[in-house]
Amino acid sequence: MAEITAKLVKELREKSGAGVMDAKKALVETDGDMEKAIELLREKGMAKAAKKADRVAAEGLTGVYVNGNVAAVVEVNAETDFVAKNAQFVELVNATAKAIAEGKPANNDEALALIMPSGETLADAYVNATATIGEKISFRRFALVEKTDDQHFGAYQHNGGRIGVITVVEGGDEALAKQVSMHVAAMKPTVLSYTELDPQFIKDELAQLNHAIELDNESRAMVNKPALPFLKYGSKAQLSADVIAQAEEDIKAELAAEGKPEKIWDKIIPGKMDRFMLDNTKVDQAYTLLAQVYIMDDSKTVEAYLDSVNAKAISFARFEVGEGIEKKANDFESEVAATMAAALNN
């Protein structure tokens, strides 16, 4: 029987990423044959990964990578925040973003079939990571963003990589594009413009806003405060030319009733129309990048600020770790029991 030396164990660990005891056991079982030991560890890793397949992985990191005129943002999940800080996990996230930016897959299946520098597929890399790290590691999603030569990427990660953003800006420079990405990270827009909002979504959100006003008015009535008006519109998508024209006529009638001389109306009407637009685009302000107040200059919307510097936002992608994943809440006793059961089954 071959002698299993510390040097041999170290070599296997470096090649496979396995722990000391797992590497030693594999070498013993294969009589010191390095290639067979690697294959054995791989098979055991797949078995361990299969056992962990039904676990919920809602922690993790985003990865961002720019490759010329193509950029990728990815989300990779782990079960705990502790593992999300593991160097091997971070390396896997970064390698995933790079592979996707360079390979430009059309969907997750194509992404997982990409060949990594190690020669294994991305899917195998995740199986092996699950086995060696000891938690379910899963590739969740990616977005590819493209630009032209005269446009700029703004790549930004926030909160230790829990949020990843890529923005494309035309005009300005990379620093401006990054500032817009910082805004996207903080303010969570879901689309670029109101034209991308679903009409039913706008109606539903407007109903929610008016419900909030109704509750507020009940509180105001208790302290003899005047009621707030309900919102008739929530988005520019609902403001037809006729609606805007009628709003201007209503303002003129209001000014006439107040006895304001017509010669000063032209100075008053634009400000009141701005107020009308602000009051009737609350859904846009919550969900569309261009309509949000810019965090770098709160006197302007993102669109108005970019206009002022001869720039324009073209597109963006924003991922936040765990969005839409239902976390499983275990009490401490259940967690300990599950950990002990897993240890006995491995």
From Swiss-Prot:
The keyword Nucleus is annotated on this UniProt entry: no
Gene: tsf
Gene3D superfamilies: 1.10.286.20, DNA helicase RuvA subunit, C-terminal domain, Elongation factor Ts, dimerisation domain
TM annotation in the entry: none
Source taxonomy: Bacteria, Bacillati, Bacillota, Bacilli, Lactobacillales
UniProt cross-references to CDD domains, sorted A to Z: UBA_EF-Ts
Keywords carried by this UniProt record: Cytoplasm, Elongation factor, Protein biosynthesis
Keyword GTP-binding: no
GO cellular component: cytoplasm
Region (Involved in Mg(2+) ion dislocation from EF-Tu): 80-83
MF terms in GO: translation elongation factor activity
Alphabetical list of Pfam families matching this protein: EF_TS
Family from the record: Belongs to the EF-Ts family.
The protein, known as: Elongation factor Ts
Localization annotation: Cytoplasm
Regions annotated as coiled coil: none
Principal location class: cytoplasm
InterPro entries per UniProt: EF-Ts_dimer_sf, Transl_elong_EFTs/EF1B, Transl_elong_EFTs/EF1B_dimer, Transl_elong_Ts_CS, UBA-like_sf
Function: Associates with the EF-Tu.GDP complex and induces the exchange of GDP to GTP. It remains bound to the aminoacyl-tRNA.EF-Tu.GTP complex up to the GTP hydrolysis stage on the ribosome.
